[in-house]
Amino acid sequence: MFSPDTNSEFYDDFYTKYNTNMAPTTSTFNAQPRLSLDSGLGLTNDSFYSTDLNETHLMDISAGNASTSFQSQPPPQLESSPPTKWARIRTPPNRKKKISHEGPNQEALPPGFNLFSPPSRKKIKTAFSSPPPKSMKTPDSLRKSIRISSPSPFKVTFSKTPLKLSNNENVTGIHIGRSGTYYNKQVTGSASKRCLLPSKPDGFTFLGSPGNSDVLDFPLQTTFEGFGDLDTPAKINAALEVNNDDSMDYYQYAGMIETSSSLATYTNSTGPLVENHARNLKSVPISRTASRNLMKISRKSVEEPVPEPQAVHVEPVIEKPTKISAKKEKEQKKSAAKEAALKEAKEKEMRIWKLAPFETPKKEVPLYSGRWLVISTGRTLAQQELFSDAKSFFKANPPPAPRAPQAPELASGPRRIPTIQRVTLFKHRYRSPRD
């Protein structure tokens, strides 16, 4: 950088000799040049940004005492850039107010607090862990795919008040869309006083097949102490076993149960409470959350007992001759006679054709027709007889033994190439387009 004291004359000579586009930038009352903060990139009007450094400096020092300070004191020594013909740009002053960390407000802030630092993880965690507002609900699309199943119809917990699925004790499993079924392993076991069935049915699982017995983590209970003084519905409607609808809720299930007081009449404690023992064998333990295909497979897997065959006297059934109407019988006889006549005419035609000698067709037979194929392959009766006669003749008269080969005589003239003649079975030879 250049000092203003030593280079003031150089600047005056430069602007008077070389710079013809702009006037010298030195003030008339001060020979010091203005300050340039860059190398001269001017993107806007020069009249807006090009201000004299001394005038700007005087305005910044004091507006009221500008004249006295200028005349009494010399201007401060500032560095300046070399002259250039591009417009000069002065950096605009920073008008943002600085935040002072010292003052009465600083005492209220916690120690080490910084406004520009990111929030701590602890604050973010508390913001997300706060309970959601009451207006937030599960989206409709997700609510449709989530299904909370009621207890299995073969292991139901009855109570005097209507059961609610919000109670974990009453929920056997939750089916969420295509992601699968989540089972509740803390389901009320067979030791519960509210349970109708004292133990789970044999081979019962939540998927309806004996292979998944590890889903339930309570063992079978063989002894049953009784239901106590609990008033519970006793008879299950038969329509409950037929219905395989997975969407049946508790209230639909409760409506299908018929109330009865004959609870002491049931002695079978390993299966569902049904009135007949034979129907108990046919019933299959299923779950409300199992798919219909699994329920069908489980039904097939259960082997039904085969009853012992009993000797039953069956009277022989004598088939009665069916009566045919006269009109139908007449039509059948007529059609049979017609078929016999056609068969006889065909056989007669074949006999005549076999006895008749072969005659060369007078007209040319269409190429690749049936008649042409029979003649060209020699399958007519006359051709077959001729072939058999020739065969028997050659067998009776065998040709003489061939003599020893002799050296061929060389022909004196040019060699002749034999031509292949056309051989046909018809009188009229085929004529080629060359002829």
Swiss-Prot record:
One of its GO terms (biological process) is asymmetric cell division. It is found in: Nucleus; Cytoplasm. GO terms for cellular component: cytoplasm; nucleus. Keywords: Coiled coil, Cytoplasm, Nucleus, Wnt signaling pathway. Residues 322-352 form a coiled coil. Residues 65-146, 393-419 are annotated as: Disordered. Strongly expressed in the cytoplasm of the pharynx muscle cells and several head neurons, probably the IL1s or IL2s, throughout development. Also expressed in some other unidentified neurons in the tail region. Weakly expressed in the nuclei of the T-cells and the T-cell daughters. Not expressed in gonads and in P12 cell. Signal peptide: none annotated. May act synergistically with the Wnt pathways to control T-cell fate specification, gonad development, and P12 cell fate specification. Required for the distribution of pop-1 and tlp-1 proteins. This is T-cell defective protein 2. It comes from Caenorhabditis elegans. The gene is tcl-2.
